[in-house]
């Protein structure tokens, strides 16, 4: 019996007001896929994630997450935002942040001994067991990212969505982030957004290119010509090493300015 797609978009369109961001989008993400969503600023990347999470509703078309509507399957998806802010005057431990993935959508709530045990195990899973009692606001960018990934994992999701996990860490720490993502169970579907093509090529197997429409390609087929055909001159692929091909993204300043805010 063929398993249902982890995520299925069928002729999905969405816009903010009069501006259409996504137009008749069709694609499937299979269970266990490791994919990245790329595209120019304003192209619809974050909008795509919000539609998967059920935070936005499409203007037309249908979205299914493991065969059900996104609203019914929110517990099956773990979400890692770009950043999470707390008032430094009000102390919040790393363990408290992870527990949010167990006690519901509110910031705080009752947690059982089993919840705390699972939260500690999730921190250990991402290699940060020693941070449980540390104040979240005092952690480095990479440590915060690890804690947020642990928060997403503690609910035992079937898929995990990461919105630009490499955006707020030093370039030298990206290898550490890739190692962190390798801690994720192989049966979990991984969907991440990134602007850094070097990180994309070394981390995922399939790329979803978004610019109103959606094009899906294996990472190995991602070329400069293909990117330019999809996005114009905003992204450029650079091969650094024939033995270990990588890539970098370069944004045309005027193109970024023309795109306006990021969606």
Predicted stretch roles:
Residues 61-75:
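Conserved ABC transporter NBD signature motif
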Residues 205-220:
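H-loop (His-switch) and adjacent beta-strand-loop-beta switch element
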Residues 160-164:
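Catalytic Walker B motif of ABC-type/P-loop ATPase nucleotide-binding domains
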Residues 53:
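Helix-to-loop junction immediately C-terminal to a conserved catalytic motif
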Residues 99, 113-131:
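Conserved ABC ATPase "signature" region
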Residues 135-139, 143:
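Conserved ABC ATPase signature
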Residues 223-263:
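ABC ATPase nucleotide-binding domains
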């Amino acid at each position: 019996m063929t398993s249902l797609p982890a995520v299925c978009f069928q002729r999905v369109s969405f816009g903010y007001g009069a501006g259409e961001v996504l137009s008749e989008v069709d694609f499937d993400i299979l269970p266990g896929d490791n994919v990245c969503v790329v595209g120019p600023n304003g192209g619809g990347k974050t909008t795509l994630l919000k539609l998967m999470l059920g935070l936005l509703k499409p203007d037309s078309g249908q979205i299914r997450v493991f065969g059900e509507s996104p609203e019914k399957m929110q517990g099956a998806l773990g979400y890692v935002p770009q950043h999470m802010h707390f008032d430094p005057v009000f102390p919040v431990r790393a363990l408290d942040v992870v527990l949010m993935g167990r006690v519901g959508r509110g910031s705080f709530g009752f947690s059982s001994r089993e919840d705390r045990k699972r939260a500690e195990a999730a921190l250990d899973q991402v290699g940060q067991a020693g941070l449980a009692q540390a104040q979240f606001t005092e952690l480095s960018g990479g440590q915060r990212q690890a804690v947020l990934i642990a928060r997403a994992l503690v609910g035992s999701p079937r898929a995990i969505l990461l919105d630009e996990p490499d955006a707020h860490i030093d370039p030298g720490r990206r290898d550490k982030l890739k190692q962190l993502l390798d801690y994720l169970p192989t049966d979990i579907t991984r969907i991440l957004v990134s602007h850094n093509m070097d990180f994309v090529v070394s981390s995922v197997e399939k790329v979803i290119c978004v610019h109103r429409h959606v094009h899906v390609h294996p990472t190995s087929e991602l070329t400069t010509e293909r990117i330019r055909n999809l996005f114009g001159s905003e992204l450029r692929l650079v091969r650094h090493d024939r033995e270990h091909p990588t890539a970098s993204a370069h944004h045309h300043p005027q193109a970024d300015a023309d795109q306006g805010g990021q969606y």
